[in-house]
Amino acid sequence: MLSALPLLFLLLGGALARPDRITFPRSACEAPPAVLSEVQGTLQRPLGRDSRSSPANCTWVILGSKDQTVTVRFQKLHLACGSEHLILHSPLQPPISLCEAPSGPLQLPGGNVTITYSYAGARAPMGQGFLLTYSQDWLLCLQEEFQCLNHRCIPAAQRCDGIDACGDGSDEAGCSSDPFPNLNPAPAPTLACNLTLEDFYGVFSSPGYSHLASVSHPQSCLWLLDPHDGRRLAVRFTALDLSYGDAVHVYDGAGPPETPRLLRSLTHFSNGKAVTVETLSGQAVVSYHTVAWSSGRGFNATYHVRGYCLPWDRPCGLGSGLGASENLGERCYSEAQRCDGSWDCADGTDEEGCPGCPPGHFPCGAAGTPGATACYLPADRCNYQTFCADGADERRCRHCQPGNFRCRDEKCVYETWVCDGQPDCTDGSDEWDCSYALPRKVITAAVIGSLVCGLLLVIALGCTCKLYAIRTQEYSIFAPLSRMEAEIVQQQAPPSYGQLIAQGAIPPVEDFPTENPNDNSVLGNLRSLLQILRQDMTPGGTSGGRRRQRGRSIRRLVRRLRRWGLLPRTNTPARAPETRSQVTPSVPSEALDDSTGQACEGGAVGGQDGEQAPPLPIKTPIPTPSTLPALATVSEPPGPLPSVPVESSLLSGVVQVLRGRLLPSLWSPGPTWTQTGTHTTVLSPEDEDDVLLLPLAEPEVWVVEAEDEPLLA
């Protein structure tokens, strides 16, 4: 454990030794090209490329304007030329392939710069890698050249030769032969320090800017800008070439003895950039400090009072140089900024009336560029809808269209996206100074979640109620009945239809069997049945001599009674009942004839032909061997039987036949008729009425007769 601590400190020391390096993980080679929008930065070969088997292809894109130059300086570049390559490409130059460090910095003008590092892989040799720094700045001129204010470079011999070689007159400004005699001459660049400039505009530069002169000791210079006007001053540094350790500071106010207020500090990181500083008052102090043996040229700057333009510039607005811009020193524009596709004026004066576009339209790019042929209307600018291919209509927006919000980076987004919890501007300025508010996504998720929870709650309540109802129903089966429920459940059933007819509650229906509610015996049921049969067999009934069609069940019952011999068959002549010799006594036909007319309710009569039905057979016990001799001695028929009512005999016969048919096993043979002397005693019908009316059953197989066939309705 102790031996690992020194190694840990060494690793931390190595990581902190170069904190300015920007390292890229291995994923930078596998993802899409990395876009670098910073003004300056550092690049090195991606770490983690220790594996020599797999190839690599890493790409970085440095965003830049077409009027800027990207300067690349190599601190280290050692690649294996056969297997590793570093390619730099810009729109205005052919690709540059490197495997060794160049002699000096590379200047790549024209806009975006693409840097590509490739490795062949397959265990090919690898170099030590590369380390470079880049910066976006204006094009720097050589030491023997003069840099114009419009960033052009001309030979130093063309300075103050009476010819406008720069195109903006900056090479002739401050000379004895000023091309603008009607204007106050601008002071010529001077090598003196600690000067006070009191004009409304002017040009000043550091000592040795026009010619490089290194000194062996540090230098310090001050310039006091006091045009004696209360309006603000705009100080613009058109060229910067500072060495390491050199610095330029801009203060607000007149300086000592007053405490100055620092507005801006410029170092070698600002080299090649055009920097504009606006004061808070009508005075400013510019200080310049160099180190010994400084290799930097210094700076070149101009100043003017807000509301005025330099003689070689044009005003953005109408009138005496007053423009509509609210930015620093941009109420004027130079000839080089005319029709370049970038709005330097807030109202687009520098891009209005350019060749190739109709009146009221603005070009997407400068002449000679791919976007120069496309033109757009003012309504298409700064509305968060890109019209130009390179997005020139959405850059440097001073004002946005209605319904849009202007970001601090001079871009526009929809106004509804402001303070919604999600940054839409590049710098996130649309979420600054916002009161606490939940994002739309959180609110939407909360609403959807609440709806889902409410739906689940309703389903849960429905299931709970259903289960409770089922459980309550199960418990109610075993629960005792209440008095009210018992009264409802135990109510007496309503009377039947036949009982209502018998009680006289409703009128009787023809051919419907009535019953006495107080007579539920078998005898009463048989009487009702015989009444139906009597009505059916009565000639000339209520139907006017025509027999009514009976129900199927009644017709079947009548056929069975006829088959059993309980009813006479129709259209059959009456015959005397056959008597069993020496066994069954017969009833004389005269007695039956006499009793036919006296038949009361419940008797059976013949059909329409008026024939008399045969008497019912009398059931006698089966003779036994002990009774055979006694019966054999009887040679004469018994005397006449006593007069028995036909109804009683018929009912008795029906009951006996039903009992013999349905209950053969329960019937014990015995004498039905008892002889006392010369006559037979018949059992009382009341003794045979105490039977149950059981459903008709057919334990035996009956022979189907012709009468069993169903009648046609």
From Swiss-Prot:
InterPro entries membership: CUB_dom, LDL_receptor-like_sf, LDLR, LDLR_class-A_CS, LDrepeatLR_classA_rpt, Sperma_CUB_dom_sf
Extracellular topological domain residue ranges: 18-441
Principal subcellular localisation of the protein: membrane
Disulfide-bond pairs as recorded: 29-58, 81-99, 141-153, 148-166, 160-175, 193-221, 309-332, 316-345, 339-354, 357-375, 364-388, 382-397, 400-412, 407-425, 419-434
GO CC field: clathrin-coated pit; membrane
Membrane topology field: Single-pass type I membrane protein
Phosphothreonine carried by residues: 596
Pro residues biased stretches: 614-626
One of the GO BP terms on file: lipid transport
Signal sequence extent: 1-17
Function: Probable receptor, which is involved in the internalization of lipophilic molecules and/or signal transduction. May be involved in the uptake of lipoprotein APOE in liver.
Protein name: Low-density lipoprotein receptor-related protein 10
Protein species of origin: Mus musculus
